[in-house]
Amino acid sequence: LVALFLWLGFWQLDRAAQKQQAAIEQKSRSGEGRLRLSGEALEAESARYREVVVAGQFVEGSQFLLDNRKHKRVAGYHVMAPMHIEGSERAVLVNRGWVAQGKSRAEVPFIALPTGLLQLEGVVRVPVSQGFRLEQQPAAAVRLYLDLQQISQMIGLELLPFVVRQQSEVENSGVGDGLIRAWKLESRDSDPAMHYG
């Protein structure tokens, strides 16, 4: 039993160190200047935490909600949509922001998807591998996890191997979308992993 608790303590300390490293990397990358996504192949690690600008069109009928996302302890979803990058045969998955869950799980919020040629700014995030999964996830309006390969097959375009967390309102859309984009910066000061370790 003691060995288990020791292992858990070291595991928590390792998680805290990983989060500290991510915070340092994120701060250093934010000073590198904005990268324009042109549809060229990009490695996930070379783009991680970079500020980007992307122009293109959201792929019609492909928006979905990523379940089990909280904002200020309120249950909700991240609104995800692939954007076909202008002048290319590639797309990038955009995390458009957070929306609260309805009064019940059966009430799925409707979020309009902007149409036409658009431009937005964001920060690159690399999705965490999900490891073991019980079954293939159906192509549905609400998903439990990201599967970039499945989304790529669904839309018929190659997806860049990362997600852009949208920071700005979409230019040229004419309306605000009401989504919350209060993305947390990785923080070493408030990391519970350090306290548990």
What are these regions (language model features)?
Residues L1-E45, Y49-G197:
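Surface-exposed, charge/polar-rich loops and edge strands
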